[in-house]
Amino acid sequence: MTPSFSGLRRARSSHLARRGVLVMALALLGALATPRADAAETLRIGYQKSSTLIALLKSNGELEKVLAPLGIKVSWHEFSSGLPLLEAINIGSIDFGADVADTVPVFAQAAGAKLAYVAEEAASPSAQAILVATASPTRTLADLKGKKIAVTKGAGSHYLLLSALAKAGLTFKDITPAYLPPADGRTAFVSNNVDAWVAWDPFLTSTIRQSGARVLADGSDGLASYKRYYLAAADYAAGHGDALDVIYGKLVETGKWVKANPAAAAGQLAALWGIDAATVEEANSHRSYQVGAVTAAGLSEQQKIADAFLAERVLPVKVDTSALAIWTPKAP
């Protein structure tokens, strides 16, 4: 029996429908197998106010330019201090952290953070200090006994205070620490609600110039070298070497530019920080901005810091600072 015209039409329609579904399925598989050219990956960068080099790179859009050929976009996330920044890396909120003080990775490691060192800034011992009011009777480190001192927990200034107390034969039991983020520490200090404040630049220089505070001690004379480190999530560092190489190169380049062009750098940062250019230039003079590769030998002070905090029972567990991964650039 010869099929009717309507039957042929239905059969043809059914065949075309099946072929259409097949074409769509193949197209979908192709899309899944081949990344879209415009589907850029996002690198989430955390930074703080003292992250000078990253602040400049963010402002001029340099990282976006050099990472675009790798198919990477950038999102920026500001933190009040280093410890919450590294905590954000550990929980997966950001991928890369701009420079934090040497003490910060030690505390993060004690909390189980899986991080990788990416770069270091050479020592800048005068870029953090213990401040007292100009008229304060506190003249020596021994005079800190019994005093209420503002300090940011886990920051480099925390170690400076510990080291300064030890030099005077004191411990944290001999003082009343007030653990405050930088902005709150400054407010407490200028309001005379604390006897001393341990701060770092640019907060340090800004407060000295504006309130006439006096430096009781900085990191010189072996108290605290104050290196700063750039870190990334360990898994990000393991899988994104090309991106980190690009960032590393820009950090080295920008650090050299800041030291070679202090007035120009201060002018740019003054607008970003809301601080006058003269103050910024003075603060920058305290920093080395010498960015280099991290080495196991160069991390020797990290263990000293960890052991000192453990002895004071500020750090809850013993930390092996050599256990953190170290990413190595192609061209140190």
Regions found by a protein language model. Give the residues of each.
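Conserved C-terminal helix/tail region of periplasmic/extracytoplasmic solute-binding proteins
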Residues: 307-332
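Pocket-lining segment of extracytoplasmic ligand-binding domains
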Residues: 103, 177-178, 183-271
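Bacterial N-terminal signal peptides
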Residues: 20-31
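Small-molecule pocket liners
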Residues: 54, 124-130, 213-214, 226-230, ...
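Sec/Tat signal peptide C-region and signal peptidase I cleavage site
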Residues: 33-39
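N-terminal secretory signal peptides that target proteins for export/translocation
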Residues: 1-16
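Secondary-structure end/capping motifs
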Residues: 238-314
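Short, glycine-/small- and polar/acidic-enriched structural segments
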Residues: 41-171, 178-179, 195-201, 224
